[in-house]
Regions:
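N-terminal capping/linker segments that flank leucine-rich repeat
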Residues: 1-58, 65, 75, 96, ...
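Short, conserved structural micro-motifs that define repeat-unit consensus positions
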Residues: 60-62, 90, 112, 123-126, ...
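Consensus "Asn ladder" position of solenoid repeat domains
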Residues: 42, 64, 85, 103-106, ...
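C-terminal capping segment of individual leucine-rich repeats
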Residues: 23, 49-52, 62, 73, ...
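Conserved hydrophobic beta-strand positions in leucine-rich repeat
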Residues: 28-33, 59-61, 78-82, 99-103, ...
Length: 199
């Protein structure tokens, strides 16, 4: 695969044509963003094998053709940009160090962030999310889930939240309780009839 070829090019230090467990553990950053100007570049469709990169901290794989993202168990991962792919499913279970997630312009139908308690920023606009629950995530400051298909959004008790954009969804209700620091709310183009902004 394209991802395997990339790994062999940069991390096969003993040139044996395979990535050993020891070599995989040396990987802390992966920059796999697709370069349209490179005529020989081939977009990545799968990140199979990334689960062995247990010490990965930063992952950028935007502008590819990835259909499924499984980063489960990568407990040192802090930054992910997987925007502009074809991702339908994303597994972030066990990503306990994750601070920033950019997953814009994909086809993600569900996103479970409950094990990502250190998240500070989430961008997941232009997906197919029908529900999103980040309630009680005490470090989350910024959330953009606009242009999805959300019928429910639970953002209550996110005590550090400053900015929420949930415009262009199908929300009929929105609970803003416990958002004492909220400074910006975009909830345009929904089915809201009332909005209680008392904090």
């Amino acid at each position: 695969s394209t991802f395997k070829n990339f790994m062999l090019s940069y991390y096969d230090q003993d040139y044996d044509g395979a990535i050993s467990p020891e070599e995989a553990l040396r990987v802390t950053e992966l920059y796999l963003g697709f370069d349209e100007e490179d005529e020989e570049a081939v977009p990545i469709t799968s990140l199979k094998g990334i689960e062995y990169c247990k010490n990965l901290i930063n992952l950028e794989c935007d502008f590819n053709a990835i259909t499924s993202l499984d980063l489960s168990g990568l407990d040192k991962l802090e930054y992910v940009d997987c925007s502009y792919n074809l991702i339908k499913t994303a597994n972030l279970s066990g990503c306990i160090s994750l601070k920033q997630l950019y997953a814009n312009v994909n086809e993600i139908g569900a996103l479970n962030l409950k094990e990502c308690a250190n998240l500070q920023l989430v961008q997941a606009y232009k997906n197919k999310l029908t529900a999103c629950d980040v309630s009680g995530m005490s470090k989350l400051v910024y959330l953009d889930v606009s242009q999805n298909q959300l019928t429910t959004l639970n953002i209550s008790n996110c005590s550090e939240m400053l900015i929420v954009n949930c415009g262009s969804n199908k929300l009929a209700a929105l609970d803003l309780s416990g958002l004492e620091k909220l400074t910006s709310l975009g909830c345009y183009n929904n089915n809201l009839t009332t909005l209680d902004t008392s904090k």
